[in-house]
Amino acid sequence: MLSSALLCCLVFLGGTGASRGQDTPAENSCIHFPGGLPHMLRELRAAFGRVKTFFQSKDQLNSMLLTESLLEDLKGYLGCQALSEMIQFYLKDVMPQAENHSPAIREHVNSLGENLKTLRLRLRQCHRFLPCENKSKAVEQVKSAFSKLQEEGVYKAMSEFDIFINYIETYMTMKIKS
């Protein structure tokens, strides 16, 4: 009985000693995340490039959906929440509708969505990049304007996706520096 208790203690202590000084895979990926961000943004831009002309040619509106107020929220104390909500907005509201506009672009919009999901997953794994709870007024304005535009909203939101990528880059650059 004493020997099995001693064996359990040794196994436990050996396991904790071996893991001390070794990062978990999630922690390890967070160390390399800033270096991999430019590649992820290039992939997003390349995926968007395959549908950009389609959506921008269909966008006949002169107004902007993604305004400076959204960029200011991303730069401010609500940056984390604004980014999280905007990723969710594109994944849940915009892209499912965008996929249905032409069979020729469905695969490309799907690929763009997968790249955005990968970015969101990495951001969530590295909590310092996405540690948020509050709501962003700018995102609420984007969602409200999108809803009012009805079908035109999809063209508008997708045609401005490159602006969103630039906003992501601005937010992440700030976070990496801090």
Swiss-Prot record:
Record-annotated disulphide pairs: C30-C126, C80-C132
Main location: secreted
Gene3D superfamilies registered for this protein in UniProt: 1.20.1250.10
InterPro entries: 4_helix_cytokine-like_core (IPR009079), IL-10 (IPR000098), IL-10/19/20/24/26 (IPR020443), IL-10_CS (IPR020423)
Keywords for this protein: Cytokine, Disulfide bond, Glycoprotein, Secreted, Signal
GO cellular component, one term: extracellular space
Any one of the GO BP annotations: positive regulation of B cell apoptotic process
Subunit-level organization: Homodimer. Interacts with IL10RA and IL10RB.
Similarity section: Belongs to the IL-10 family.
Name of protein: Interleukin-10
Organism: Oryctolagus cuniculus (Rabbit)
